[in-house]
């Protein structure tokens, strides 16, 4: 019986050691992170409503200076970002959708960057950044997460498209 308890305990310790740890990430002063979920989808493709929403995103951010656009490699995310990328003359940089926040913030201090994500990576991003309130998980939600020159974080939520 003691051996079974020992092995069970050892198994739990090993399992805990293999569990990824999410570390807190800080937005550098002067940095703006714009977060949006991909448009409406059918499988991995955008529906006509999703295509319209992608165009609406480009219109909503037409006057916003954006330095970099990041997305997962899913077609629906890239298709959501394409009209905006084209309008701004930017490429879309794909990032694996696990542990996104440190990957997209690295080397972007003082810049404005856009993340076109999914429910499964936007919600953890909110947690990693220590943000309160609801993450922008609905179609048409648009979040502007800003760190002012002192590093104080503010979040402005808006909607775009119909």
Description of each model-found segment:
Residues 5-20:
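N-terminal export signals
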Residues 20-109, 121-162:
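Active-site-proximal alpha-helix that buttresses catalytic centers in soluble enzyme cores
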Residues 111-113:
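Alpha-to-beta junction loops
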Residues 116-118:
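Short beta-strand segments
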């Amino acid at each position: 019986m003691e051996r079974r308890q020992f092995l069970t305990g050892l198994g739990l310790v090993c399992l805990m050691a293999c569990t990824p740890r999410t570390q807190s990430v800080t937005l550098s002063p002067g940095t703006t992170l714009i977060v949006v979920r991909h448009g409406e989808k059918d499988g991995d493709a955008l529906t006509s409503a999703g295509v319209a929403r992608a165009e609406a995103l480009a219109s909503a951010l037409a006057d916003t200076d954006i330095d970099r656009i990041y997305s997962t490699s899913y077609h629906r995310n890239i298709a959501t970002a394409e009209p905006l990328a084209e309008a701004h003359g930017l490429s879309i940089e794909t990032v694996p959708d696990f542990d996104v926040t440190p990957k997209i913030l690295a080397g972007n201090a003082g810049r404005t960057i856009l993340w076109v994500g999914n429910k499964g990576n936007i919600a953890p991003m909110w947690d990693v950044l220590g943000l309160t309130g609801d993450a922008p998980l609905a179609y048409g939600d648009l979040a502007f997460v800003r760190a002012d020159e002192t590093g104080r974080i503010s979040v402005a939520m808006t909607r775009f498209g119909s």
